[in-house]
Structures are given as C-alpha cells and as structure tokens.
C-alpha cells in the first residue's frame, strides 16, 4: 500500500518515489513484522519459516548459521526447528515468528498484538525478548490492548474512535 496523502520516508528514502520492487527490498531489509496470529507457513518447518525471508532478500539459503542462532536465541532447539507450525505450542510459534522477523536484521519491528494469543507466562517471556531487542537498538512499534504489555513502552499513543486521544 502507498500513503493516500503526505510522504513516508524510511531509511532516508521517500517511499512515494519508489517502485514496487524497491519497496519490497526496503521492507525485506528494514522492517520485521510480528503478527498476532503468527502467519507461519503451514507446510514449512520452523527453520524454513525463519529462513524464507532470508532467501527472499539474499536469493540463497542461509549458510551463515543466522537462522539456527536466532531460533536458539528464542529457545527453539534443532529438534523443534524441524517441526511444522501445527506441531508447536502457541508460545513456540510466536518465538519462531519473532526469529523470522529478525532474520534480515531489520532496524524496525512492527508488532501487532504480539502476546494476544498467549498465556500470561508466555506473554511475559515474549515481552522480555522484545524489551531486550529494544535495549539492543531496535525500534519497536507495537499495537496492544493489554495495559500490562503497554508498560514496556517508552511512549504510549492511545487511539480512541479512530483518533489519537
């Protein structure tokens, strides 16, 4: 999608002036997406789900060990990384989704209710992972309805009835 009005600059580039290919490359290199419903590809293993955006950006399989390292950082061992999404718990799926969002080393993470489908203990673990990523220099933009989750934010913007409140 493109802005209906105004300009959007990302990484010093005006996105209005970019063609679809340039926008795709910018998204692959600068933005990681963490979805509420994980959006893992059912036919791929956890490892392959994380590797997929890497292949899209680099046009080759990961030969650096980055996918394996990210999965390990998220607590997904080599045995679990071979499992399909439906064989993983909700918390494990969310960890895989976070690893996938990080695989291309984006500066920005867009997080849509990253703990919305998780129990309280797993939610806390996920928020600690995200807080650590922020401490390491990532920009996180997070949408949440959960007041506890919002306490992790440096800045809170409330939207009520479609307007910034």
Residue ranges and their predicted role:
Residues 6-14:
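Conserved ABC transporter NBD signature motif
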Residues 13-14, 62-79:
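Conserved ABC ATPase "signature" region
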Residues 44-51:
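Short coil-to-helix segment of the ABC ATPase nucleotide-binding domain corresponding to the Q-loop/switch region
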Residues 84-88, 92-94:
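Conserved ABC ATPase signature
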Residues 98:
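Hydrophobic anchor residue at the start of the ABC signature
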Residues 105:
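Conserved catalytic motifs of ABC-family nucleotide-binding domains
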Residues 109-112:
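Catalytic Walker B motif of ABC-type/P-loop ATPase nucleotide-binding domains
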């Amino acid at each position: 999608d493109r802005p209906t009005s105004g300009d959007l600059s990302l990484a010093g580039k005006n996105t209005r002036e970019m063609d679809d290919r340039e926008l795709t490359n910018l998204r692959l290199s600068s933005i990681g997406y963490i979805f509420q419903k994980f959006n893992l590809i059912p036919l791929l293993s956890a490892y392959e789900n994380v590797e997929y955006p890497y292949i899209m950006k680099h046009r080759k399989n990961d030969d650096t060990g980055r996918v394996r390292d990210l999965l390990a950082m998220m607590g997904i061992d080599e045995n679990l990384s071979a499992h399909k999404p439906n064989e993983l718990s909700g918390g494990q799926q969310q960890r895989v989704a976070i690893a996938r969002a990080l695989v291309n080393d984006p500066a920005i993470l867009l997080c849509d209710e990253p703990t919305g489908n998780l129990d309280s203990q797993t939610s806390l673990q996920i928020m600690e992972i995200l807080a650590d990523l922020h401490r390491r220099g990532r920009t996180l933009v997070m949408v949440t309805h959960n007041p506890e989750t919002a306490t992790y934010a440096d800045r809170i913007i409330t939207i009520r009835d479609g307007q910034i409140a």
